[in-house]
């Protein structure tokens, strides 16, 4: 059975995990790290770079480097590169492809099935877009799971009955969830958050501060210099991390820009107190979702058994202090790595779905109410927020006018009483209603939410049996053929990357062989017969010529030729050595005689192993 992985597709970093003998293991990527930056870059030569390599070259390639694309999921955001449009699903698919590749390399087998996590506050469109990103990357997405739900699964699998508060502050999204665990059931009682608040915003405050300080000191606005801004962003992130463990840090960026007087350098001290002052309003924004969750769940603070911190941003001392203050002095549980816990939970959920993990039932909830617009622009809710999913609810509606031939069903997601103030997810029309006075027709509207949080809406005229259906995807859903096209495109990029890698390897082998052969000829000039030397030099010259071009096949052929003819160097030298030995007569001693056997008898085309050598001499 094919292995299934759990993927935490984060705003700033992503993690992939797999079950090994029933235990979740975080997979180390090709660069040797356990987290992969969610950064995609398009090099000038057309190569797609993902992860650490993309992040490293961002300074010199700002316009062609894309980060934090998760914030655009489910929107019509696009980026145009080399005359080609890329949407958030395609960019995310590049990150997922890398995680898939790293997992395959680690496991030594194909990986197709995956569970991918999303913030609890993601709406329908954002969830659908995440699922599509997985499909474009060539993954069969078994389930889209809320991040705090995954964290609870990783944390609470073998625990007793308890209430857990998950405080998840990542790079770009923030949510708070309250979960009940017991009898193998993980149930999300309430969830709330802000999907435009995260560590990136803390970094941005430091960047703004540095720009302001530099402008007042040098009169130069660094905000207008893209490359300088990129360096500032990296330095701000580093400073934020350092201030989590020390009370002061220095940001030193030489040659940040130049003025008429010459190059300018940035050198600023930043204390933890200053940093906390700069970001105090961001911390304040974390409070409302917390209070909302406690109110929605209808519990007292004293009922919370454990507090779990998720996301690298929770390492900031001010955040940890805030959580302690909000929860009435409760210390957060330190037994979980905040960067990896979500991916671990996703791997466990993949195990549940594959039947590898037993005795766990995962109950998720819908984060926002769902309903339709009725007369007067009112939002009539069919499914209240925090309803456990999968779920199905239906209600009977009627017409507002006499002889109304059709009804328009407009689906909304949100908590406002007026439909227009909520997020519109889609609309469709049920036509062909028979003429009747208003209030007579009976139209049943049913909302059906599947385990991924994707909703299907049906409207049925109970009089005629006419029915109209739609899958609500917030307008972001891509047609199947579009997803297929993008998947093929992603595969094509992967093939191109593979071809580039092969070409680079062939070139490296060729260059290495040229160097080794030329060195050998130089070191053994007097021992190599003239005709052999000429033949080898000719093959080397031909290979050097091919290395100037770009034809990989020709480079490979020329390399093989050099490898073949250079064997004659060794043969010629051994023949000379044997001739010299024969001319000198047999050396005395039994050992010498044993070693002096015919060359062909004693040549083994393999590594020398002591045991074999003894056997051979016996």
Curated annotation (Swiss-Prot):
UniProt cross-references to Pfam families, sorted A to Z: HSP70
Biased composition (Low complexity): 580-593
Keyword DNA damage: no
Listed GO biological process terms: chaperone cofactor-dependent protein refolding; protein refolding
GO MF annotation terms: ATP binding; ATP hydrolysis activity; ATP-dependent protein folding chaperone; heat shock protein binding; protein folding chaperone; unfolded protein binding
Keyword Translocase: no
Region feature Disordered, mapped onto this chain: 487-512, 580-618
Cysteine disulfide partners in this protein: none
Modification Phosphothreonine occurs at: 173
Bias (Acidic residues) ranges: 601-610
Composition skew (Basic and acidic residues), residue ranges: 487-505
Induction or repression: By stress conditions e.g. heat shock.
Gene3D superfamilies found in the cross-reference section: 1.20.1270.10, 3.30.30.30, 3.30.420.40, Actin, Chain A, domain 4 (3.90.640.10), Substrate Binding Domain Of DNAk, Chain A, domain 1 (2.60.34.10)
Keywords assigned: ATP-binding, Chaperone, Nucleotide-binding, Phosphoprotein, Stress response
PANTHER family on file: HEAT SHOCK PROTEIN 70KDA (PTHR19375)
Protein family: Belongs to the heat shock protein 70 family.
Entry function: Acts as a chaperone.
HAMAP family the UniProt entry points to: DnaK (MF_00332)
Record-given protein name: Chaperone protein DnaK
